[in-house]
Every structure is written in structure tokens, then in C-alpha cells.
UniProtKB/Swiss-Prot annotation:
<keyword id="KW-0698">rRNA processing</keyword>
<keyword id="KW-0808">Transferase</keyword>
<dbReference type="GO" id="GO:0009383">
    <property type="term" value="F:rRNA (cytosine-C5-)-methyltransferase activity"/>
</dbReference>
<protein>
    <recommendedName>
        <fullName>Ribosomal RNA small subunit methyltransferase B</fullName>
        <ecNumber>2.1.1.176</ecNumber>
    </recommendedName>
</protein>
<dbReference type="InterPro" id="IPR023267">
    <property type="entry name" value="RCMT"/>
</dbReference>
<feature type="binding site">
    <location>
        <position position="277"/>
    </location>
    <ligand>
        <name>S-adenosyl-L-methionine</name>
    </ligand>
</feature>
<dbReference type="InterPro" id="IPR048019">
    <property type="entry name" value="RsmB-like_N"/>
</dbReference>
<keyword id="KW-0949">S-adenosyl-L-methionine</keyword>
<comment type="function">
    <text>Specifically methylates the cytosine at position 967 (m5C967) of 16S rRNA.</text>
</comment>
<dbReference type="InterPro" id="IPR001678">
    <property type="entry name" value="MeTrfase_RsmB-F_NOP2_dom"/>
</dbReference>
<dbReference type="GO" id="GO:0003723">
    <property type="term" value="F:RNA binding"/>
</dbReference>
<dbReference type="Pfam" id="PF22458">
    <property type="entry name" value="RsmF-B_ferredox"/>
</dbReference>
<dbReference type="InterPro" id="IPR035926">
    <property type="entry name" value="NusB-like_sf"/>
</dbReference>
<dbReference type="InterPro" id="IPR018314">
    <property type="entry name" value="RsmB/NOL1/NOP2-like_CS"/>
</dbReference>
<feature type="binding site">
    <location>
        <position position="303"/>
    </location>
    <ligand>
        <name>S-adenosyl-L-methionine</name>
    </ligand>
</feature>
<feature type="binding site">
    <location>
        <position position="322"/>
    </location>
    <ligand>
        <name>S-adenosyl-L-methionine</name>
    </ligand>
</feature>
<dbReference type="GO" id="GO:0070475">
    <property type="term" value="P:rRNA base methylation"/>
</dbReference>
Length: 429
């Protein structure tokens, strides 16, 4: 039996590591969840994700409720109060229980002398909640985005920025990809129905199913046997444009964790696929996915800017470049992105994308297809990136996705309930 731990203090420390140390929640959270019971894992995740989703609001409230900020060794208390406020605002946890557990969290972080302070701040919020929220809702902070990102969204999408920001703050649906080599989508949906769950097919992507209610993967029919994979609908859209064929040599560049590698092999089981990623640690995820689905691909560690180091002079029939990006299209899945990214990251990422595009293009056969994809909504990484590439690359031609003036296809988060995603299909003349 696992030792009873204070979830509020664990969540506070996790959020502090994200905000103060720039660590990714996807690295921090899983080890913490191993320390708690199964029933507490979901609550711990909800507290971490929820606080990061609403961080700017919680920060603003604390500044209103406290005369001076908590600093130094007491900084964790700041995040513990955030966890308390989040529970009072956004969860069904009874207020008395939320207060009691949050106050007890002070003992777990070795600040028992501050229990009274934490209790006082949270009770003051309860008294002033209506007044404070009315004031907060007149400010830009109500969109729950850092100001630099809000400005970029407003500039890029004068008519849509509010709906994009709102979509980023929602809980994402759970999308699945049905392995067409095992089942048709309809036959798998029948199995799902027999298991007491309901799913809905995507109108455009033939393998995509949205669960009515998110479920643990072990509850999905045939998950361990490779019948189904968790993958957002927009990510599945890459195959629409790549259209892999049996017998072709196909490169999946920046491939980890391998979702698109395995999708290529589901669509074209006899393709020769090379999956490359710069992060050696993440290559294990590609191997895990290939093993679960019973597939084979050549997996290599390599930098997309220097392809000759890992493929020599080899050329490919098709290349999928899922470029490193700001991930501003998947904020609803990874709310820490809002606080890990900085405005200065965008031109740096655009430069990296440009270098990879230029380096990999010679490795595409004449007549071949390259699909450039990102999970970003920012034009600098997407349409402007491809427009510049087309202008400097004489043998590159845009195909089916947009126009030379406005190249590519941009999915916005929430549109068709998929993530924010960009695709551009390029043909080598």
C-alpha cells in the first residue's frame, strides 16, 4: 500500500519546477504519479494541469490578496496557495476540504509556521471572490496567456484570436487512431460499444475516433495488441497529405515518439521507413510503439540539419518533416507550454526549421513529396516559413495545400476538435 501523501504540496512543487526552473510537466509528473494511489493520480494531474492552465489568473489573485509576494525558500508557498485557489474556483472539491488539505500541505513542504497565512489568504478570497473576479474579468489576463503570445495571436488572427485563446484553455478530447491493418474503423467502434464506451468518427480523417469520455488506454479494446493508438486527429491528418505507398522509401524526420512512423506503416505496411530524431532518449518511445504494433522500421539518432551524417547520399520517395516548433497549437494538452516558451524562441525556432528544410530537400527524389508539419499556430513557423522556402528553392512546388501567397493548411485548436496544426505538401519538380 502506497504511503498517503499530500497531493496539494506535490502539485505546488511540480508547478514551481515548471515556472521557476523551466522544466517540462511531462517529465515531472509521471514520477510523482508513481508515488500515489491510482485514485489520486487523476487528481494530482488535474491540480498540476489546472494551475498551469489558469496561472496568470491565480498569480493576479495572489497579488491582490497578499501585501507582498513570497520569495526565496518560501516561494513554494506561493504555488501552494495557487493550488488552493484553483480548487476553490474550478473543482467540485468541497471548500472546507480544499482549505484543510492545502493548509496541511504546509507541513509537507516544511513550512508549518505558515499554515495560518495560507488559511487566511484562502478565506479572504472566499469573502472577496465576487469582487475580485469582476475586476479580473476586465483585464487581458483573463485570456490566461502570457502577453507576448496574446499579442502574436492578435496580430496573426485579428478575427480569431479570442476563440484560439479560449480553445487553448479547454480540456482536450481524447482522439484515437484505429489500426486499419487489424480492423476497419466501424468494426472497432462496435468493439468499443461492447466495452460500454462510445466513440465518434472524424469526418475527414479515416482512422480517427473521438472518445465521448477519455478512458485509460488499458480499457481500450486491443490496445496492447496494437489495434488502436492514442493520437490527436490533426496529427493523423499528416497521412492525408503524405499518402505513403507500399514499396517506397520514406523518411520520418523528427519522428519521436513514433506516432506518425507507425501511422505510415499502417497505411503502407510494405514501405521502407527510416525514423530519425535528435533526442536519443526519446528514440526508446519509437521502439516501444513499433513493438506494441508489431512493426519494423529503421530508427536512427540524428540532427535534421546534417542528414549526410546519418543517411549519406540516400534519397527518399517521401519525407515527413514534423518540424521542431513552439507547440502553440497543443497548449490545451500541455498548458506548461504557455509558461515555458518565450517570445525570443519564435525567431530561433523559425531559423532552425529553415535550416532543416534546406538540408533535407536534396535527399528527396525528383517527383517526390515532402510534407512539412508543425503543431504551431504562428505564421512565422508555418505559412511564412513555407513561402520563404518556395521563393528560394527553384525545384519546390506547393501541392494541394493553400496558394503560393498563403501556402499551407492551418488547423486551429478546437476546429473539428483537433489540435492546432499546420501542413504544407511540397513536390520536387
Amino acid at each position: 500500500m502506497k504511503k498517503q501523501r499530500n497531493l496539494r504540496s506535490m502539485a505546488a512543487q511540480a508547478v514551481e519546477q515548471v515556472v521557476e526552473q523551466g522544466q517540462s510537466l511531462s517529465n515531472i509528473l509521471p514520477p510523482l504519479q508513481q508515488k500515489v494511489s491510482d485514485k489520486d493520480k487523476a487528481l494530482l494531474q488535474e491540480l498540476c494541469f489546472g494551475v498551469l492552465r489558469t496561472l496568470s489568473q491565480l498569480d493576479w489573485l495572489i497579488n491582490k490578496l497578499m501585501a507582498r509576494p513570497m520569495t526565496g525558500k518560501q516561494r513554494t508557498v506561493h504555488y501552494l496557495i495557487m493550488v488552493g485557489l484553483y480548487q476553490l474556483l474550478y473543482t467540485r472539491i468541497p471548500p472546507h476540504a480544499a482549505l484543510a488539505e492545502t493548509v496541511e500541505g504546509a507541513i509537507a513542504i516544511k513550512r508549518p509556521q505558515l499554515k495560518g497565512l495560507i488559511n487566511g489568504v484562502l478565506r479572504q478570497f472566499q469573502r472577496r471572490q465576487e469582487e475580485l473576479l469582476a475586476e479580473f474579468n476586465t483585464r487581458d489576463a483573463r485570456y490566461l496567456h502570457p502577453s507576448w503570445l496574446l499579442k502574436r495571436l492578435q496580430k496573426a488572427y485579428p478575427e480569431q484570436w479570442q476563440s484560439i485563446a479560449e480553445a487553448n484553455n479547454q480540456r482536450p478530447p481524447m482522439w484515437l487512431r484505429i489500426n486499419r491493418t487489424h480492423h476497419s474503423r466501424d468494426s472497432w467502434l462496435a468493439l468499443l460499444d461492447e466495452a460500454g464506451m462510445k466513440g465518434f468518427p472524424h469526418a475527414d480523417y479515416p482512422d480517427a475516433v473521438r472518445l465521448e469520455t477519455p478512458a485509460p488506454v488499458h480499457a481500450l479494446p486491443g490496445f496492447e495488441d496494437g489495434w488502436v493508438t492514442v493520437q490527436d486527429a490533426s496529427a493523423q491528418g499528416c497521412m492525408t497529405w503524405l499518402a505513403p505507398q507500399n514499396g517506397e522509401h520514406i523518411l520520418d524526420l523528427c519522428a519521436a515518439p513514433g506516432g506518425k512512423t507507425t501511422h505510415i506503416l499502417e497505411v503502407a505496411p510494405e514501405a521502407q521507413v527510416v525514423a530519425v530524431d535528435i533526442d536519443e532518449q526519446r528514440l526508446s518511445r519509437i521502439y516501444d510503439n513499433l513493438k506494441r504494433l508489431g512493426m519494423k522500421a529503421t530508427v536512427k539518432q540524428g540532427d535534421g540539419r546534417y542528414p549526410s551524417q546519418w543517411c549519406g547520399e540516400q534519397q527518399f520517395d517521401r519525407i515527413l518533416l514534423d518540424a521542431p516548433c513552439s507547440a502553440t497549437g497543443v497548449i490545451r494538452r500541455h498548458p506548461d507550454i504557455k509558461w515555458l516558451r518565450r517570445d525570443r524562441d519564435i525567431p530561433e525556432l523559425a531559423q532552425l526549421q529553415s535550416e532543416i528544410l534546406d538540408a533535407i530537400w536534396p535527399h528527396l527524389k525528383s517527383g517526390g513529396t515532402l510534407v512539412y508539419a508543425t503543431c504551431s499556430v504562428l505564421p512565422e513557423e508555418n505559412s511564412l516559413q513555407i513561402k520563404a522556402f518556395l521563393q528560394r528553392t527553384a525545384d519546390a512546388e506547393l501541392c494541394e495545400t493553400g496558394t503560393p501567397e498563403q501556402p499551407g493548411k492551418q488547423n486551429q485548436p478546437g476546429a473539428e476538435e483537433g489540435d492546432g496544426f499546420f501542413y504544407a505538401k511540397l513536390i520536387k519538380k
